[in-house]
Swiss-Prot record:
NCBIfam families hit by this protein: purM (TIGR00878)
Organism whose genome encodes this protein: Shewanella frigidimarina (strain NCIMB 400)
Name of the protein in its database record: Phosphoribosylformylglycinamidine cyclo-ligase
GO annotation terms (biological process): 'de novo' IMP biosynthetic process; adenine biosynthetic process
Gene Ontology annotations for the cellular component aspect, listed alphabetically: cytosol
The gene coding this protein: purM
Species lineage: Bacteria, Pseudomonadati, Pseudomonadota, Gammaproteobacteria, Alteromonadales
This protein's record includes keyword Ribosomal protein: no
Amino acid sequence: MTTPTPLSYKDAGVDIDAGNALVNNIKSAVKRTRRPEVMGNLGGFGALCELPTKYKHPVLVSGTDGVGTKLRLAIDYKKHDTVGVDLVAMCVNDLIVSGAEPLFFLDYYATGKLDVETATSVVSGIAEGCFQSGCALIGGETAEMPGMYEGEDYDLAGFCVGVVEKADIIDGTKVKAGDSLIALASSGPHSNGYSLIRKVLEVSKADPQQDLAGKPLIDHLLEPTRIYVKPLLKLIEQSDIHAMAHITGGGFWENIPRVLPDDCKAVVKGDSWKWPVVFDWLMTNGNIAQHEMFLTFNCGVGMVIALPTEKVDAALALLTAEGENAWLIGEIATRQGDEEQVEII
């Protein structure tokens, strides 16, 4: 009788040594994100974090998100260093809408076969996003699952927790007719609409390496999502913010109403800002209607802020000083009956 060959976890497709190599590779990047509230070091069963002592009645705010099919482009064109920033941005930009300061972040990286170099690049991007937003990368999960993913494919998910003073929560209840709307510029499509973007590339048979306004089209499409946390925390301290809307999936039509009272609508002047060239390219090459553009993409606006009209000039000056491109794009008006809550004129 032949003795069966002894099997190992590695024979089944899971390389523990590769996982350990990844942890060693990312230690310095993760350490850079540490906050004073974090207790212990990377690698424990559970990550510990104290609440900052400056809060009298702290309220925790949580969010989870992914990068969607933008990952498909990143994988196909082997550009893995920015999707980690995207992952963090999608979470922390949701938290700041409530006025919350991000505290800590955890990531989930899943793949069929762990490529240490690729994973190091991705997680380093996650650490960079955490650094930009001032939150600690305190843990995560790297799942190597043979048979679950094809080839070099991987998927990402992120989870973030922030904190806000209970009395300072921004929830849209203060919004009223006469408020002004400020927009913060996006860096591109951010992390939404990529299934349509990929369809436009397929139908138009465009070369993603073609030049568009001085750089390859693919670089426009993979530009990382802008993180607005630090400038908005400063704005919140110095102004009276009534509401903020993170313009993600669903675009203007679906995200702005999420922070408006039922008796209010947003009137947006569509010519008050210039679309980044990548959106013009998508609209033309995909023959996409303008309504569909505003439903699918941010069209150059990553965040919309509602505030009293008398606060606009100071807010624009502060945001500009913080390196943001910001514009006055409209106002809040009284909604009549069952009118749409967003009107683009």
